[in-house]
């Protein structure tokens, strides 16, 4: 078969090779060579050695990122401290301003408002701190408060014995007073019980040797 040119011959050979490859499911030597060249180029691009300068650049970049993160942390900590000191100074200035004793004529309306606000705030904080965790004690205290209020509305004046448990407290106080009357500070009996059947110069309850009860009767 004669061809007009080399290009037409090359094209005809390619078409025939493609037909055979499709029928027989085989690869032509040209296609094999093409695939080999492609893989070679890929391996060349993959196994490209890294220069020492590139390594140094990479190390510097990583160190720069670390230093930047450290500086950011330091700045954040410094700002935090500054804000804390500013708040403390503000609180201290308010404390000096409003705890300074002034006359009512000198105080302005804004001062009075702020003082009332400050008082309420302090009362709330104290109530939170003094809140009793034990429910039983809290209930007992509430009961005593209610009883005191009820007695106050009925009588007007509230004493120790007006609420439950007051009688016991009163008895306890009376017993303590009696004990204090019976003994002086040195452990000796100081009331009339000790003076009965006692004589000067002797221990309480003993009489002198020459003492006779008949003389006492005379």
Curated annotation (Swiss-Prot):
Subcellular location: Nucleus, Nucleolus
The keyword rRNA-binding appears for this protein: no
A Pfam family of this chain: RRT14
Keywords in alphabetical order: Nucleus, Transcription, Transcription regulation
Major subcellular location class: nucleus
Gene Ontology CC: nucleolus
Source domain of life: Eukaryota
Comp. bias regions, Low complexity: 28-38, 59-70
Region of interest (Disordered), ranges: 28-53, 59-78, 180-218
Family per similarity comment: Belongs to the RRT14 family.
Main function: Involved in ribosome biogenesis, probably through modulation of rDNA transcription.
Protein name in UniProt: Regulator of rDNA transcription 14
């Amino acid at each position: 078969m004669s061809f007009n040119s080399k290009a037409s011959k090359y094209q005809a050979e390619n078409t025939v090779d493609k037909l055979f490859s499709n029928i027989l499911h085989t690869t032509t030597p040209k296609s094999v060579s093409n695939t080999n060249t492609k893989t070679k180029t890929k391996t060349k691009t993959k196994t490209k050695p890294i220069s020492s300068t590139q390594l140094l650049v990479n190390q510097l970049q990583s160190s720069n990122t670390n230093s930047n993160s450290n500086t950011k942390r330091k700045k954040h900590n410094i700002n935090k401290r500054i804000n804390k000191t500013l708040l403390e100074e503000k609180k201290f200035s308010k404390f000096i301003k409003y705890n300074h004793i002034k006359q009512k004529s000198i105080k302005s309306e804004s001062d009075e408002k702020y003082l009332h606000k400050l008082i309420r705030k302090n009362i709330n904080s104290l109530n939170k701190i003094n809140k009793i965790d034990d429910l039983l004690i809290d209930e007992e205290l509430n009961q005593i408060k209610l009883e005191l209020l009820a007695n106050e509305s009925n009588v007007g004046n509230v004493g120790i014995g007006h609420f439950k448990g007051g009688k016991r407290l009163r008895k306890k106080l009376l017993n303590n007073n009696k004990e204090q009357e019976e003994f002086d500070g040195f452990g000796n009996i100081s009331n009339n019980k000790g003076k009965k059947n006692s004589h000067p110069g002797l221990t309480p309850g003993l009489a002198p040797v020459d003492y006779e009860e008949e003389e006492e009767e005379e």
